[in-house]
From Swiss-Prot:
Protein known as: Ribosomal RNA small subunit methyltransferase H
Described purpose of this protein according to its UniProt entry: Specifically methylates the N4 position of cytidine in position 1402 (C1402) of 16S rRNA.
Signal peptide start-end: none
Location of this chain's protein in the cell: Cytoplasm
Organism: Campylobacter jejuni subsp. jejuni serotype O:6 (strain 81116 / NCTC 11828)
Amino acid sequence: MEIPHIPVLLNEVQEIFKNLKTGYFLDCTLGFGGHSEALLKNHPDLKFIACDQDQQALEFSKKRLKDFHNRITFIQSNFSEVLEKISYKEELRGILADIGVSSFQLDNNERGFSVNSDFLDMRMNQNSKISAYEIINTYTKEQLTSIFKDYGELHDAHFIAEKICLERSKNPIKSAKELYQIIGKGKQNHRKISKATLAFQAIRIEVNQELKVLKDFLGHLENLKPKNCILAIISFHSLEDRIVKNFFKKWSKNCICDEKIMRCECGNNHSLGQIITKKAISASKEELLKNSRSSCAKMRAFYFNNLDNK
């Protein structure tokens, strides 16, 4: 079986979860099963719940992981909703979310993620109603400016939005290739990433509501308050990493009083656990040589030891 995607930070993920023995492991973003396959092999007593919203990825992974069929349950769902769909919440001992786009999705022409694509789609869930085509051809100039500024951190967001609106007034923009030509190939000041790459990333975030989905998922976990459970999240965008970092920082604090208050009034017992990774884990030099797409990957991990489930 040809594997269409190389899992990022595979060794680092295995290291984070190396001490897991029994219970359930939730792979929130199964993709093509690389992380789950390695963990299934190394943890024979763990049971797995594998989730993905991409039907193609799910079908592939069912075949790839067929030897473990008696230990794994598959769910098609966005990862922000998966906690509502599982029955073993109290037995969760490990949770992994790799929230990047797979190589298969990037390289698949019809999915419209790549700047070289003949399509303009970018939906991770093909059943979603809004695609990049609708956003590029129907959003107002102000809405497009906001997307490029907030999600792409592009200084000339207004200019890019203006160019798009001008071109679509002549004819609808139908392909990623066409959009790429409109945006241009220049770099964003001194950043290594091209302006078009940042703009495409911003559009993808809007199409899939990626930041909202991440916040919703972390909010559900905060309400769930797992016990004796390790959470690891791999992100590929600075905005996503910032969200994860801030949630972990919040969860690790005992005191949740306003910083302006001189003395603690909350009981000083609100910590959900400890941050495992003092700083984000990045790909090694060896991995970068094998898989250049791992260059943006950042993993953070948190241990929920909320034994009293306050």
